[in-house]
Amino acid sequence: MIRRPPRSTHCISSAASDVYKRQITFHAGAHSMDRHFQEESAEKNMPVIMAMITVWYNAFFNCQSSAVVPYSHRLKELPFYLQQLSMESLGKSVTKENDQVSINTGEILWGTVGTNSQHSYFQLLHQGTQFVPVDFVAIAKTRSKSADHNEMHNHLLANCLSQSLALMKGNSESEEAQKKVTGNKPSNTLLIDELNPFNLGCLIALYEHKVFVQSILWNINAFDQWGVELGKIISKDIYKELTSTDNESNELDSSTKNLIKLIKRNMPHK
């Protein structure tokens, strides 16, 4: 008699195998960008070009923030990942030789899914006074066979391309000042043929190498985070104060002491 594994065990095994295959494919995509970064000339090297553009905007246009706007709900977490990658790596004010930097480094990176943002901060991008370069990320095709889904996807792509075009060209012909959009606002459009593990790995590695190149150009260490570590150390001391019944510490400033008093006053009594 042949003993078959329980159906649920087989499903778990198949799911684990599928996840492993996707992970391998994801790493293969990242490795392909590693090879591109290592072997391609600077003139055609995507991470180098993107880093050079960002450093140029930072130095000569006083650019202090940039946006990443994916036009795909499946990439909704991408801006948050890139926030940590960029700001934690490049938020430094001393060089590798421990000297104070003489130029601006790093930038505030932010963004959300495109269709959500069109009715919020895109007004500022088009007609505001801030200089904010934008990276659009779009997916060329969808795997869905649904006609309605494909129609919706085409509208999504149309919105993406129209926003980048409007940023570039504007609408300065309008006679009414409040309707004028000057244009000449920079953006990149990263068009991915299909969203799959390989292409996602390639996309993530692209930004990782871009950040590394920026750190080289600014001569800063992208691989430490002492500001974050300081916050962790201080939080331990604050926690002790919050949970202590002893007199308050003299090492804290008056503002923090008062905040702790207010919190303790509203804590449930043991």
Predicted regions and their residues:
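A SIS-like phosphosugar-recognition module
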Residues: 4, 21-270
